[in-house]
Amino acid sequence: MLLLAKLPEAYAPFDPIVDVLPVIPVLFLLLALVWQASVSFR
């Protein structure tokens, strides 16, 4: 996170987006697991 701390102030509004980015693949994985479970149980 040291790189993000060195960004200019102009990028400050984008900090929440950068914080959320690592969570998106996990959400897709969970969505895939739930979809597979619903299809297999049906």
Swiss-Prot record:
Localization per Swiss-Prot or TrEMBL: Plastid, Chloroplast thylakoid membrane
HAMAP family named in the record: PSII_PsbK (MF_00441)
Keywords: Chloroplast, Membrane, Photosynthesis, Photosystem II, Plastid, Reaction center, Thylakoid, Transmembrane, Transmembrane helix
UniProt keyword Metal-binding present: no
Self-association state and partner proteins as the record states: PSII is composed of 1 copy each of membrane proteins PsbA, PsbB, PsbC, PsbD, PsbE, PsbF, PsbH, PsbI, PsbJ, PsbK, PsbL, PsbM, PsbT, PsbX, PsbY, PsbZ, Psb30/Ycf12, at least 3 peripheral proteins of the oxygen-evolving complex and a large number of cofactors. It forms dimeric complexes.
Name listed for the protein in its UniProt record: Photosystem II reaction center protein K
InterPro entries with a match to the protein in the record: PSII_PsbK, PSII_PsbK_sf
Known function: One of the components of the core complex of photosystem II (PSII). PSII is a light-driven water:plastoquinone oxidoreductase that uses light energy to abstract electrons from H(2)O, generating O(2) and a proton gradient subsequently used for ATP formation. It consists of a core antenna complex that captures photons, and an electron transfer chain that converts photonic excitation into a charge separation.
